[in-house]
């Protein structure tokens, strides 16, 4: 059996984040992060630990309608059991009525570690480039 390119596994990890959050599959979402992860989303908030970030995302997305987190331009660098990734994000978060929403553009800077369970995000910084609203609530 051959080992896969770690960049493919990390790309799958990043897609798993989007899939977990958009489907509100919180057990899947939790598999993206280390237990002691640190996430800094600037004005949106800062969270320490997978429980804290999962609870926040669950509560805020419970009020939302449909969401789509599209991740592109994944620049991944691997050094042994550590990696870094910069990923562009184009997120559409519909309000509960699905008639209006927010479009957030920015990028994630991730520090990723290989664990016994596979690659996990240990630290994430979200930098927003533009946030716009659309539609009539």
Segments and roles (model prediction):
Residues 12, 67-69, 104-105:
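Short solvent-exposed loop/turn micro-motifs enriched in small/polar/acidic residues
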Residues 93-98, 133:
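A short, acidic/glycine-rich surface segment
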